[in-house]
Amino acid sequence: MKKTILSILLTLSLILLAIPNLWATDYQHTLKVEEMNFSWNLNESTMDIRISAETTGWVGIGFNPEEHMLGANIILGYVKNGKARIEDHYGTQKRAHGPDEKEGGSVNITNPEGSEENGVTTLSFTIPLNSGDKYDPPVKTDGISTMIFAYGGDRDSLRTRHHFRTTWEINLKTGEGKKR
């Protein structure tokens, strides 16, 4: 009986060692984007993302806007009472965005998590590289992506205006980026 249990434990240990990223919190790439931090992993068909800023309000990221926010796939959220609220938005105008669902799209965020510690809000989530949703343009993995970053003040509401925003050009495959 002891040999059987020992054999099972050894087998489980070997399986867990063979899957090193199962509980990994490390990211392939991390950039300090002025007042925010952006970390990500590119997988075969998805992208794991972590964004954070020194705020107790919302934080957000947008992918490949046409101009300002127009046409961007925008993910933003906040943490309230220890629970993350993360939404999938689309840039409907240069200076406006709204939930994908209101436009006829769908929410394409998985693994939503968040924390608010020592005045810093951190969100992590996974998005598909190409969801097929017209309100989530495909994420560019080769070449330069235009990325927008923003965070709001110290209020748990997505209706508040940003206190900080910036636009960067980032090569998501190499991790290189610069302010636009």
What residues fall within each predicted segment?
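Bacterial N-terminal signal peptides
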Residues: 8-18
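Extracellular-facing/secreted segment signature in eukaryotic proteins
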Residues: 23-180
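Positively charged n-region of N-terminal signal peptides that target proteins for export
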Residues: 1-4
